């Protein structure tokens, strides 16, 4: 079978030629890199990557295949996938489909056999930028660069309303090896693009979970008499989400315990008077070392930031300063 060609074009005019490992066609979005060494299926299905083309810095991808359980949502949300090398074999007892077929079945473009170290350095030095992947025959480089430049970035885009659940639902499933704690807390979850594993971990704590759409109003949330409200992860720019900021403000005024992660963390900061600004390049990955300057201990973390100078006084210290 003849291999299809593909190119990745950046808005700065840089071209990478490689092999197509997914669907044929064309797509654009914001290109980012993720430093995780595993979990590529979870990354692909994480709603936080909506409208982004994800570059995996680890060079060898696909060796464990894919399955129908290790997903963070019901579909692939990222616009495209960029890797250095696609494994030609899959070795895992839970494998059900190889990565290439998985991408094709979900109509997602992917490109391999490019210099991902060079690409990552460009993103690191120049910042996240628009990009495009074109896969198939008779690809024109100028057209690919033009397609990349058509994407205007994520600033100002409210993507939470596109990835959120349409109707409320309950969640009880825990992690597959987890043992549920015995608690009686009821938690309302505002879904801005929540990952299933976050819900599983919360369920392991014994929480009674009710998940609500992103635009759920204050009155409906408190109608279930929750002990707290969880503000989920999600994609896009937090500032256009006025509906969520308004609801969160009312919750804080009521004294409701709140916990935000990713987009939810940024929305909580905005509701309390903080500010967010786009980072030069995002800290995507689960393997970022952070040292506690008091204890000298190092933790390996996923990072979420707000601008330290704008941190509201009523938010305690001890977190990691930065930007979104």
Per-region residue spans from a language model:
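Ser/Thr-centric signal marking residues that sit
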Residues: 116, 301, 310
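Cysteine-nucleophile active-site neighborhood
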Residues: 227-228, 233-304
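Conserved functional loop/turn residues at catalytic and ligand-binding sites
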Residues: 206, 225, 255, 310
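Single conserved hydrophobic/aromatic residue that forms the stacking wall/gate
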Residues: 304-315, 320-324
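Glycine-rich, phosphate-binding/catalytic loops in enzymes
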Residues: 205-206, 246-248, 323-324
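RNA-binding accessory domains that recognize and position tRNA/RNA substrates
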Residues: 2-215, 219, 224, 238
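Short, solvent-exposed coil/turn elements at secondary-structure transition points
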Residues: 116, 193, 215-217, 264, ...
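Short solvent-exposed loop/turn micro-motifs enriched in small/polar/acidic residues
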Residues: 1-2, 283
């Amino acid at each position: 079978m003849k291999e299809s060609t593909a190119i990745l074009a950046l808005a700065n005019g840089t071209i990478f030629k490689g092999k197509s490992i997914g669907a044929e066609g064309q797509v654009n979005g914001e290109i980012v890199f993720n430093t995780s060494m595993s979990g590529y299926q979870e990354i692909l299905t994480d709603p936080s990557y909506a409208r982004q083309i994800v570059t995996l810095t680890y060079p060898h991808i696909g060796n464990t295949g894919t399955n129908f359980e290790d997903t963070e949502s019901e579909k692939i949300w990222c616009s495209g996938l960029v890797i250095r090398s696609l494994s030609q074999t899959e070795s895992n007892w839970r494998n059900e489909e190889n990565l290439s077929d998985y991408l094709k079945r979900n109509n997602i473009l992917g490109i391999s056999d490019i210099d991902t170290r060079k690409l990552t350095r460009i993103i690191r030095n120049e910042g996240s930028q628009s990009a495009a992947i074109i896969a198939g025959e008779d690809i024109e480089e100028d057209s690919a660069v033009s397609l990349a430049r058509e994407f205007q970035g994520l600033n100002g885009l409210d993507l939470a309303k596109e990835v959120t659940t349409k109707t409320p639902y309950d969640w009880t499933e825990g992690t597959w090896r987890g043992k549920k704690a015995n608690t009686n807390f009821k938690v309302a979850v505002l879904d801005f693009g929540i990952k299933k594993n976050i819900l599983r971990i919360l369920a392991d704590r014994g929480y009674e979970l009710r998940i609500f759409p992103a635009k759920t109003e204050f009155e409906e949330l408190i109608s279930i008499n929750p002990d707290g409200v969880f503000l989920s992860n999600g994609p896009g720019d937090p500032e256009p989400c006025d509906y969520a900021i308004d609801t969160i403000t009312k919750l804080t005024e009521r004294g409701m315990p709140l916990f935000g992660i990713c987009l939810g963390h940024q929305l909580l900061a905005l509701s309390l008077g903080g500010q967010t600004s786009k980072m030069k390049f995002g800290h995507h990955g689960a393997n970022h070392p952070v040292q506690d300057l008091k204890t000298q201990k190092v933790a390996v973390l996923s990072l979420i930031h707000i601008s330290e100078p704008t941190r509201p006084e009523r938010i305690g210290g001890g977190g990691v300063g930065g930007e979104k």
